[in-house]
């Protein structure tokens, strides 16, 4: 099974206080004046001071090879803040920085390195606070209330650039070609990297690098850049600058999973749960006009209305896509929830998943073989598990120390209230019955007889997402479930973490002295009627898993307090995020896909119609990243996920997989 941890950098500090890589025997920045060198080489070499005021787009995208200590990023962020203060009315409003790092620093080493530049402390402290775990792939950090976005891609840049989604092609405005010197790290400075830089660069994009090595200049020229030498910084004689003057036409490697966005900035979101709320915020941050239509009279009346929900990543013993997506989604969710300027009941007390029988123990052993960072997930023996959770269990398991619980109902309402302050328009008691394409817009028809017209539409209405002609063929299904609310007792109040077994039990919410225990599972059932049998089973599953635990007998469901909801799920346990696919056109256009992959056209979709759904039972974990992915896609901005994992979230994936194998789609 693949290992999912990234090796951190090993470094030491020399006499000047400069960090030095033990792996590459090279400094992370100049001993003389690393800050001024960055300003000269990368900001000056890309002419950013003169380009920012005349940039004709709200977003400026910079890509970098080798994040290191983050000096280049912090220096650019500082300069961007100065520009925004001096030019508040400029078209350019936001900065997006994409960087690749094979050996990321630990948070402690990062903080030590940042002590070198006190003037960057206000920006460095924000970076340190959100510094991600060493997991492979993309980590999106939203900084300065979302005005600055940092995408940290952990892994080998030559491998990662081959895994980028095609939507990133021709989007980069400036390249910082940095890293350890070519003589120290020749594996990075390859034609593959130079070609990737050219593929990602938009026409007119610039690049700058500290080196003047001939093979670097020639490689970049062969990739498509027009190169020139410039006086180097300090004692260095020369450096290189370049411009992408050509109009390259990158090919699509998997057109059947291609994602299209919108040139428009106006949309209707259908739904009223956590997905709709977070998507509204993500689009508003990008300057969209957003109208939310909800069938209920207030938010969070569906699956997002529970009192307590567990937050922890889904891991799989066999599905690589799940193991790539959910750890990243979980860490993004924690960063986002912690940064939201709203209040909601929550406790990041940890989550422990126990192996109560042989089958569950085998599953946990396979999950632990992923070798995830200990800060994300680690093994517990029986004694350690009992110390962690605070009650007798007599079995070990896997613990997620950064997990916990939150109140989805409060969170959803608070986020929608925040979005409303930022310009969100809300329309409650609006039940959508049909969508009709009209020229370049969509007409929405509601049960009341009202209609509305919007340039784009996002369906994020839970298990009702397949109620329309365009979405009826989607392979999603409803899952009804009941969560029981139980009063705490002295024994139950000892529970310190969310306990997962063949069900789950939360610690008490100190605001109401109640726990949540659940949940029943009724596939294909959309009923929200309270069931006495579900109430009994929620208790019985706990007793069956821990038959010797006296504290478990104190679970009292006789008060009949519970909440029934309906989730939307897929058989592969992954969300559906992206364009709504045209089922009939997909089957027609891709009828011979298995034999004609090289000539395939981009996937047939309904223009301007998007979806965010099938979050299953892990919506609290997946909704934040899914909302960010869809907002980025709709806005034609960089998407924070590799192409393979994005394909696993594509709403057409289950059909396309069969068509690629020449199998019939049913």
Curated annotation (Swiss-Prot):
Cofactor(s) required, per the database record: FAD
Primary site of residence: cytoplasm
Subcellular location: Cytoplasm
Xref: SUPFAM superfamilies: FAD/NAD(P)-binding domain (SSF51905)
EC numbers, comma separated: 2.1.1.61, 1.5.-.-
Annotated region described as tRNA (mnm(5)s(2)U34)-methyltransferase, given as residue ranges: 1-245
GO molecular-function term, one example from the UniProt record: flavin adenine dinucleotide binding
The keyword Acyltransferase appears for this protein: no
GO BP terms in the entry: methylation; tRNA wobble uridine modification
Domain of life: Bacteria
UniProt region (FAD-dependent cmnm(5)s(2)U34 oxidoreductase), positions on chain: 270-666
Annotated TM spans: none
Keyword Ligase: no
Annotated family: In the N-terminal section; belongs to the methyltransferase superfamily. tRNA (mnm(5)s(2)U34)-methyltransferase family.
Function summary: Catalyzes the last two steps in the biosynthesis of 5-methylaminomethyl-2-thiouridine (mnm(5)s(2)U) at the wobble position (U34) in tRNA. Catalyzes the FAD-dependent demodification of cmnm(5)s(2)U34 to nm(5)s(2)U34, followed by the transfer of a methyl group from S-adenosyl-L-methionine to nm(5)s(2)U34, to form mnm(5)s(2)U34.
Designated name of the protein: tRNA 5-methylaminomethyl-2-thiouridine biosynthesis bifunctional protein MnmC
Source organism: Salmonella paratyphi B (strain ATCC BAA-1250 / SPB7)
Origin organism lineage: Bacteria, Pseudomonadati, Pseudomonadota, Gammaproteobacteria, Enterobacterales
């Amino acid at each position: 099974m693949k290992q999912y941890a990234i090796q951190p950098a090993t470094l030491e500090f020399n006499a000047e206080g400069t960090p030095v890589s033990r792996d590459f025997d090279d400094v992370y920045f100049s001993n003389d004046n690393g800050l001024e060198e960055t300003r000269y080489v990368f900001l000056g070499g890309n002419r950013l001071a003169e380009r920012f005021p005349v940039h004709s787009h709200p977003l400026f995208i910079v890509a970098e090879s080798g994040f290191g200590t983050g000096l280049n990023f912090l220096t650019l962020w500082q300069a961007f803040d100065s520009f925004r203060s001096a030019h508040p009315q400029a078209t350019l409003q936001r900065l997006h920085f994409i960087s690749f790092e094979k050996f990321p620093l630990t948070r402690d080493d990062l903080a030590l390195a940042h002590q070198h530049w006190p003037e960057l402390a206000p920006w460095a402290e924000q970076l340190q606070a959100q510094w991600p775990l060493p997991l492979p792939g993309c980590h999106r950090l939203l900084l300065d209330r979302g005005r600055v976005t940092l995408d940290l891609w952990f892994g080998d840049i030559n491998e990662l650039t081959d895994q980028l989604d095609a939507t990133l092609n021709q989007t980069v405005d400036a390249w910082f070609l940095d890293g350890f010197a070519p003589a120290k790290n020749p594996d990075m400075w390859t034609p593959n990297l130079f070609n990737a830089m050219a593929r990602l660069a938009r026409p007119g994009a610039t690049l700058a690098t500290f080196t003047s090595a001939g093979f670097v200049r020639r490689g970049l020229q062969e990739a498509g850049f027009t190169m020139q030498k410039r006086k180097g910084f300090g004692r260095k004689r020369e450096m290189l600058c370049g411009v992408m003057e050509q109009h390259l036409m990158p090919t699509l490697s998997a057109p059947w999973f291609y994602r299209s966005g919108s040139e428009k900035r106006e949309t209707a979101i259908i739904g009223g749960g956590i997905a709709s709320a977070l998507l509204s915020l993500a689009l508003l941050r990008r300057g969209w006009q957003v109208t939310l239509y909800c069938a209920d009279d207030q938010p969070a009346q569906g699956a997002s209305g529970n009192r307590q929900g567990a937050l922890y990543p889904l891991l799989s013993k066999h599905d690589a896509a799940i193991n790539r997506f959910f750890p990243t989604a979980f860490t993004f969710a924690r960063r986002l929830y912690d940064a939201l300027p709203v209040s909601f009941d929550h406790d990041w007390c940890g989550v422990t998943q126990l192996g109560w029988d042989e089958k569950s123990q085998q599953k946990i052993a396979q999950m632990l073989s992923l070798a995830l960072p200990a800060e994300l997930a680690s093994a517990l023996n029986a004694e350690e598990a009992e110390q962690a959770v605070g009650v007798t269990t007599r079995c070990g398991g896997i613990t997620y120390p950064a997990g916990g619980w939150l109140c989805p109902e409060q969170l959803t309402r608070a986020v929608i209230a925040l979005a409303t302050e930022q310009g969100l328009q809300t329309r409650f008691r609006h039940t959508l019955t049909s969508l009709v394409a009209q020229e370049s817009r969509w007409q929405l028809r509601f049960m009341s007889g009202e209609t509305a017209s919007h340039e784009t539409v996002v369906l994020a209405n839970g298990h009702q997402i397949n109620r329309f002609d365009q979405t009826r063929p989607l392979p999603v299904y409803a899952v009804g479930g009941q969560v029981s609310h139980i009063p705490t007792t002295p024994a139950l109040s000892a529970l310190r973490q969310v306990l997962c077994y063949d069900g789950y039990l939360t610690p008490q919410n100190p605001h109401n002295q109640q726990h949540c225990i659940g949940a029943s599972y009724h596939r294909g059932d959309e009923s929200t009627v309270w069931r006495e049998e579900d109430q009994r089973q929620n208790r019985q599953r706990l007793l069956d898993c821990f038959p010797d635990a006296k504290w478990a007998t104190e679970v009292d469901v006789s008060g009949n307090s519970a909440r029934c909801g309906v989730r939307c799920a897929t058989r592969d346990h992954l969300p559906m995020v992206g364009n709504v696919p045209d089922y009939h056109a997909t089957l027609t256009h891709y009828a011979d896909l298995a034999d004609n992959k090289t000539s395939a056209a981009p996937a047939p979709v309904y223009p301007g119609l998007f979806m965010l759904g099938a979050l299953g039972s892990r919506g609290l974990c997946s909704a934040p990243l899914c909302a960010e992915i869809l907002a980025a896609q709709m806005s034609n901005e960089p998407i924070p996920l590799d192409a393979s994992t994005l394909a696993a979230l594509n709403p057409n994936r289950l059909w396309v997989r069969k068509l690629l194998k020449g199998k019939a789609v049913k």
